[in-house]
């Protein structure tokens, strides 16, 4: 999880940042999670990686202002993705699968959040969007 959720974000930033700085424009969209705001049982490491994405993004936001680069973190609740299939512990995977079957919203909901952040005027920086399915308590 650390390699994908934390190092992957860092590598993506490192690859794109020089190009955005040259253009004096750009927009990073980093993916966190509701888990980055609230830790639940059996997901401390996942929550830690998603919290790291939020913290890295906030630091990046402050550092890239001279180049007119925007930074948005999308923290979502349950979205219909492959996440439930990536859990290796059978009991936890079963629980997550049932949770997602009950609560997950379509991936299009996530796409609309991204489109909202990107469609703002150049002088507006939507720093964070936190959304959940209406029925999701966590």
List the predicted regions and their residue ranges.
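Active-site helix of classical SDR
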Residues: 13, 49
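Active-site-adjacent segment of SDR/Rossmann-fold oxidoreductases
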Residues: 38, 59-69
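A short helix-coil junction within the Rossmann-fold of NAD(P)-dependent oxidoreductases
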Residues: 15-24
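C-terminal helical subdomain
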Residues: 69, 73-74, 81, 93-137
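Residue(s) in the substrate-gating loop at a strand-loop-helix junction
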Residues: 33
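Active-site loop immediately N-terminal to the catalytic Tyr-X3-Lys motif
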Residues: 38-44
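A hydrophobic alpha-helix adjacent to the NAD(P)-binding/active-site core of NAD(P)-dependent oxidoreductases
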Residues: 1
């Amino acid at each position: 999880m650390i390699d994908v959720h934390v190092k992957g974000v860092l590598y993506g930033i490192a690859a794109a940042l020089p190009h955005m700085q040259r253009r004096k424009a750009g927009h990073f969209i980093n993916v966190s999670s509701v888990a980055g705001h609230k830790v639940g049982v059996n997901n401390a490491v996942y929550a830690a990686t998603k919290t790291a994405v939020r913290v890295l993004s906030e630091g990046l936001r402050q550092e890239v202002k001279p180049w007119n680069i925007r930074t948005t973190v999308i923290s979502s609740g349950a979205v219909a993705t492959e996440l439930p299939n990536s859990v290796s512990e059978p009991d936890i995977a079963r629980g997550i699968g049932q949770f997602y079957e009950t609560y997950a919203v379509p991936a299009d909901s996530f796409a609309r959040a991204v489109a909202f952040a990107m469609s703002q005027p150049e002088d507006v920086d939507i720093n964070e969007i936190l959304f959940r399915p209406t029925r999701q308590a966590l």
